[in-house]
Regions:
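Cytoplasmic-side transmembrane-helix entry/capping segments in multi-pass membrane proteins
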Residues: 7, 60-69, 116-129, 178-187
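Hydrophobic transmembrane alpha-helices of multi-pass small-molecule transport proteins
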Residues: 45, 119-139, 195, 249-250, ...
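Helix-helix packing/entry segments at the starts of transmembrane helices
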Residues: 34-36, 77, 92-99, 169-192, ...
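Transmembrane alpha-helices of multi-pass small-molecule transport proteins
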Residues: 26-75, 101-107, 162-167, 184-203, ...
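C-terminal transmembrane-helix exit sites in multi-pass transporters
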Residues: 47-56, 100-125, 253-273
Length: 302
């Protein structure tokens, strides 16, 4: 049952991160907000570990958990939030986010030995095409089309997506066993190792403590860091990483719907058409594929 509903819940929880980021940017600096979020998330997961008497991993696995957290959370969200705060348009950032499943699919055969079949490759390409259609109006908007002033933030945004792709594959290869609660706790320690020095070096640690800022922080900790990330780790462990990553394609259309409800942003025809293409791509990528007997023998030998 959980295997069926987990992707749906994950898409909803993960997509709210974009709305939360919009609220949080008004009330806090990016690294400061993320550092507080990671610290509270680590404490929340630690409390669950103690309450449930979870078995902690050995030193080698603990190090791998901390290391993976540096990429899954620290470099990824730190780079993404900083890039958006420093001039990368949301539409372009959406395209970059949509690149993650393609990066994952290309790297998975090399790093974790997964093989994608033709239909799954088609699904990944359709997902990217759907995202491009959905946000095409923003690409041709003069207010968002000029990226000459945002070369460095754009590069940081690209590096952030490569970071979460690497972190996802590393998680799949090296953290397939053990209790997920201690692993998640240690991953947020890894995120703090990245974020705290950035906060101390580049920010004044501004957080205004308003009701909106606190609400965004609470949701970031319990809805995103615990709910969304917990489900992501579960999906990575239960299925192929490229299939789990393909769910990222559903984020921009879902965020657009949430932005329409929360901020009154219009739902355009390209967005609706793009969403249809995206959903088709995700379906093809996640559809079970029958492996021919000859291919199955080759996989067993590998």
């Amino acid at each position: 049952m959980l295997d069926r509903i987990a992707p749906i819940i994950f898409v909803f929880l993960w997509s709210t991160g974009w709305v939360v980021a919009k609220y949080a940017a008004i009330h806090s600096e990016p690294f400061t907000f993320l550092a507080v979020r990671y610290a509270l998330s680590a404490l929340a997961f630690l409390s669950l570990c103690l309450a449930m008497r979870a078995a902690w991993p050995g030193r080698a696995v603990a190090f791998k958990a901390v290391y993976s957290g540096m990429f899954l959370h620290g470099f990824y969200l730190g780079g993404l939030w900083w890039a958006i705060a420093n001039g990368v348009p949301a539409g372009i950032s959406g395209i970059i986010a949509a690149l993650q499943p393609l990066l994952t699919a290309m790297a998975a055969p090399l790093l974790v030995g997964e093989r994608l079949h033709g239909v799954q490759r088609l699904g990944l390409l359709l997902g990217f095409l759907g995202i491009a259609i959905a946000i095409s109006p923003k690409l041709f908007d003069p207010a968002t089309a000029d990226l000459a002033h945002a070369a460095v933030p754009l590069a940081i945004n690209l590096i952030a997506m490569c970071s979460v792709t690497y972190g996802t594959l590393y998680q799949k290869k090296h953290l397939q066993t053990g209790n997920l609660l201690p692993i998640a706790t240690l991953q947020y320690v890894g995120a703090l190792i990245v974020t705290v020095p950035l906060m101390l070096s580049f920010e004044r640690m501004h957080f205004d403590g308003s009701a909106q800022a606190v609400a965004a922080l609470i949701w970031s900790v319990f809805g995103l860091s615990m709910g969304g990330v917990g489900l992501l780790l579960y999906l990575i462990r239960r299925g192929q990483v490229s299939r789990a990553a393909s769910l990222i394609y559903l984020m921009p259309p879902t965020v657009a719907l949430e932005a329409f409800i929360a901020f009154g942003e219009p739902l355009t025809l390209p967005l609706i058409l793009g969403t249809i293409v995206v959903v088709t791509g995700v379906y093809l990528t996640n559809r079970p594929v029958k492996v021919p007997p000859q291919d199955a023998k080759e996989l067993q030998r590998a």
